[in-house]
Design a protein with these regions (language model features):
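Positively charged, small/polar-rich N-terminal and surface patches that mediate targeting and assembly
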Residues: 1-112
Length: 112
């Protein structure tokens, strides 16, 4: 089985996050995206410290689909430099991990 990844990204607001999530799931780039509003981010950008409300997206995908997910997310994201970070899932419920892999197949298998 392909390596499963958990991809972390922030968006400026819940509506933008939901739009990104829906597109990525509809295009089979992510099997599932959790949208978690209410995040506060503090970061340094262009020489200043900023504090902003953001919404977190937690995406589940495969290593094989990650390059396409990253490219699509980068194209759709409103930030100049979006936070897109992926970590490998070292363990999980095998049936769930299989489901993630099946939902992100470029060409879905026939349910024959």
């Amino acid at each position: 089985m392909d390596t499963i990844l958990l991809v972390y990204c922030t968006a400026p607001d819940p509506d933008t996050a939901r739009e990104l999530a829906r597109t990525l799931v509809e295009e089979r780039l992510a099997a599932c995206v959790n949208v978690l509003p209410g995040l506060r981010s503090l970061y340094r950008w262009q020489g200043r410290v900023h504090e902003d409300a953001e919404t977190l997206l937690l995406m589940k995908t495969t290593a094989a689909r990650y390059p396409a997910l990253q490219e699509r997310l980068r194209a759709l994201h409103p930030y100049e430099l979006p936070e897109i970070v992926a970590v490998s899932v070292s363990a999980g419920l095998p049936a769930y991990l299989d489901w993630v892999a099946a939902q992100t197949l470029d060409e879905p298998e026939d349910p024959a």
